[in-house]
UniProtKB/Swiss-Prot annotation:
It comes from Vibrio vulnificus (strain YJ016). The lineage of its organism: Bacteria, Pseudomonadati, Pseudomonadota, Gammaproteobacteria, Vibrionales. GO terms for cellular component: plasma membrane. This is ATP-dependent lipid A-core flippase. It is an enzyme of class 7 (translocase). PANTHER family: ATP-BINDING CASSETTE SUB-FAMILY B MEMBER 10, MITOCHONDRIAL, ATP-DEPENDENT PERMEASE MDL1, MITOCHONDRIAL. Disulfide bonds: none annotated. Keywords: ATP-binding, Cell inner membrane, Cell membrane, Lipid transport, Membrane, Nucleotide-binding, Translocase, Transmembrane, Transmembrane helix, Transport.
Length: 583
């Protein structure tokens, strides 16, 4: 799946507007406050005309006495409107960013496993953090400048044309050139912003890789390797940032230079007698000040172009992400609790991008309440079969049935509630042990149920020694627990779920011999009246299985009970001899 980012700015903004309009009341208040702010600035400039023509030009005028009150009132209004607009827009943009992040997060949870196989986790995190934050630039800072500076420009232009349309006509000649310059730098900003997003994802991935593998880095002395790698990607980010800053720095003087030409022309025209005769000192000062006043909003609009384009580029990437097809869930069949009979019928499967199949024409049955074990060397396809049971992937051909119904016909969430999985790669959440055992169960289980599951998994042996017991927070991915302890918590989670089909994917591989023996007795109890698929490396754990399948190169090469396979003296017997040091 590739993300199509060829989407117009206008279309992207229209999609972003669906989030912004949810908070249109706050937006409306902010826009009104921004307009008031801009009008107060324009009115301040307009006071120069009566100040010069009446205040200093007429001894009878009382304008100078009222001017301090006017200025104070305008500054007060300007301050209040500035606070209101900033607060309201921050509230709007904060909510929009929150909604966008939730949208991306929720879509991640709907994506198929194959998507995460191809994407770097650092890039995925960057979309939730960096890209989502950039959207704020388009919904707050950019909007502030567009409304306030846009209103200022309109107000100053009206003021100029009202006082001297002849001098103001010069701007009509300059405006197209300014518009072209802003359009040109907008395209440049857009391109650089896209590159910055990509580079930020690479930076995040590089840092995450080091943090997750820091023990390997330290053990193998890889500090210099990681330092060099991060130096390269961080320098790439710096280069992209400098390109953006260079474009911004060049855009401002170019536009100011164009505007200064207009000012030069105005100064020249003001010296022409036919125009000069119509000007008063106040009129000329207002027009000239308004033209100078246009510099600031024009500069701000040029700067906001980069902010707006960064926000649009980020929004475009995020919308392209949520446009990706989620995990297929076309099934409608649902059952409260399956009986647990599993039939695997001539299935074949190839991972996306792989040249050869991971599984080829595999068939076997697991009767209700029986145990089937899969053994074989690493990479032979054992875990792939388990992933197909729960539809983390879909078969290319053949079918897997649960109680005689194709698993693709089940409603996906309902299907997965029929399975409990304990794998060799245990993932625990940064939460209490109790909440990890009862993960996603809500109030379905009582405290006693959780304790009983922990007892059966022999987890209470170490939990009871902890100060907070089941309320102990385990840290990120169970960092405060040993490998064996994490495995016992995972087994307790599966025990509590009490699903009709149990998948044990190297479930005891992280345990020492004593712990394995203790937990194996709990697993034996758990497997009663359940359909069990066991993927094992230690053959001692599956000798009691009703049927053992030897998987090699994606195909079943042997099947039978432990004693039958030993007697056959084939691949299984050879594995057995290697593990137990026989002959």
């Amino acid at each position: 799946m590739s993300i199509n980012t060829d989407e117009s700015t206008w279309r992207t903004f229209k999609r972003l507007w669906t989030f912004i309009r949810l908070y249109k009341s706050g937006l409306a208040v902010a826009v009104v406050a921004l307009i008031i702010n801009a009008v107060s600035d324009t009115y301040m400039v307009s006071l120069l005309k009566p100040l010069l023509d009446e205040g200093f030009g007429s001894a009878e005028s009382d304008f100078l006495r009222t001017l301090p009150l006017l200025v104070f009132g305008l500054m007060f209004i300007r301050g209040i409107s500035s606070f209101v607009s900033t607060y309201c827009l921050s509230w709007v943009s904060g909510n929009v960013v929150m909604q966008v992040r939730r949208m991306v997060f929720n879509h991640y949870m709907q994506m198929p496993v194959s998507y995460f196989d191809k994407e770097k986790s650092g890039s995925l995190l960057s979309r939730i953090t960096y890209d989502s934050e950039q959207v704020s630039a388009a919904t707050s800072q950019a909007l502030v400048s567009i409304v306030r500076e846009g209103t200022s420009i309109i107000g100053l232009l009206v003021l100029m044309f009202y006082n001297s349309w002849q001098l103001s006509l010069v701007l009509i000649l300059v405006a197209p050139v300014v518009a072209w310059a802003i359009g040109f730098v907008s395209k440049r900003f857009r391109k650089i912003s896209k590159n910055m997003q990509t580079t930020m994802g690479i930076v995040t991935s590089s840092a995450e890789q080091m943090l997750k593998g820091h023990k390997v880095v330290l053990s193998y002395g890889g500090q210099e390797v990681e330092k060099s790698r991060f130096d390269v990607v961080s320098n790439q980010m710096r280069q992209q940032s400098m390109k953006l800053i260079t474009a911004q720095a060049a855009a401002n003087p170019i536009i100011q230079m164009i505007a200064s030409i207009a000012i030069v022309v105005v100064l020249y025209l003001a010296s022409v007698d036919t125009i000069k005769d119509q000007l008063t000192p106040g009129t000329f000062t207002v027009v000239f000040s308004a033209m100078f006043g246009l510099m600031r909003p024009l500069k701000a609009l040029t700067n906001v172009t980069s902010q707006f384009q960064r926000g649009m580029a980020a929004a475009q990437t995020l919308f392209a992400l949520v446009d990706l097809e989620p995990e297929k869930n076309t099934g409608t069949y649902s059952v409260e609790r399956a009986k647990g009979e599993v039939n695997v019928k001539d299935i074949s499967f190839t991972y996306e991008g792989a040249e050869k199949p991971a599984l080829s024409h595999v068939s076997f049955d697991i009767p209700r309440g029986k145990t089937v074990a899969l053994v074989g060397r690493s990479g032979s396809g054992k875990s792939t079969i388990a992933n197909l049971f729960t539809r983390f992937y879909d078969v290319d051909s053949g079918e897997i049935q649960l109680d005689g119904v194709d698993v693709r016909d089940y409603e996906l969430k309902n299907l997965r509630t029929q399975f409990a999985l304990v794998s060799q790669n245990v993932h625990l959440f940064n939460d209490t042990i109790a909440n990890n055992i009862a993960y996603a169960a809500g109030d379905k289980y009582s405290r006693e149920d959780i304790e009983r599951a922990a007892e059966l998994a022999h987890a209470m042996e170490f939990i009871s020694k902890m100060e907070n017991g089941l309320d102990t927070v385990v840290g990120e991915n169970g960092a405060s627990l040993s490998g064996g302890q994490r495995q016992r918590v995972a087994i307790a989670r599966a025990l509590l779920r009490d699903a009709p089909v149990l998948i044990l994917d190297e479930a005891t591989s992280a345990l020492d011999t004593e712990s394995e023996r203790a937990i194996q007795s709990a697993l034996d109890e758990l497997q009663k009246n359940k359909t069990v698929l066991v993927i094992a490396h230690r053959l001692s754990t599956i000798e009691k299985a009703d049927q053992i399948l030897v998987i090699d190169d994606g195909a079943v090469v042997e099947r039978g009970s432990h004693s039958e396979l030993i007697e056959k003296d084939g691949a299984y017997a050879q594995l057995h001899r290697i593990q137990f040091g026989e002959g």
